[in-house]
């Protein structure tokens, strides 16, 4: 359950067999496709770019659309360096979610405990 705030906010959709780790936030305008894994501490919003390492691309929401996490993606929390000005001068970084791989047999065996607990 949840509340759409502001009124024009787009919903969150989490498809079947998604594993959501503790302290994870999935907010307005985010779609998580089936069998994805969101590791502990991952924060996803429509305005958050997601860095897909296996496919060497950046996933962003289209104007007015939703951020879509691909089916089977394994997403962890990460950071990227601030590349200009004060941030660069002080070695600052910004949070970013990173897809490190897509589900495989090893991932499935690691998440099997979740099935037993259901």
Predicted regions and their residues:
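Structural signal for interior beta-strand "rungs" in well-ordered beta-sheet cores
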Residues: 1-87, 99
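C-terminal catalytic lobe of FAD-dependent flavoproteins
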Residues: 90-118
């Amino acid at each position: 359950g949840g509340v759409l705030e502001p009124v024009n906010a787009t919903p969150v959709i989490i498809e079947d067999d998604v594993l959501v780790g503790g302290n994870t936030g999935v907010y307005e305008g985010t779609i998580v496709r089936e069998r994805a894994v969101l590791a502990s501490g991952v924060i996803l919003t429509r305005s958050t770019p997601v860095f897909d390492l296996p496919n060497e691309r950046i996933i962003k929401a289209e104007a007015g659309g939703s951020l879509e996490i691909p089916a089977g993606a394994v997403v962890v929390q990460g950071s990227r360096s601030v590349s200009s000005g004060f941030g660069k001068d002080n070695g600052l970084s910004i949070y970013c979610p990173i897809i490190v791989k897509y589900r495989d047999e090893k991932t499935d065996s690691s998440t099997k405990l979740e099935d037993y607990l259901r």
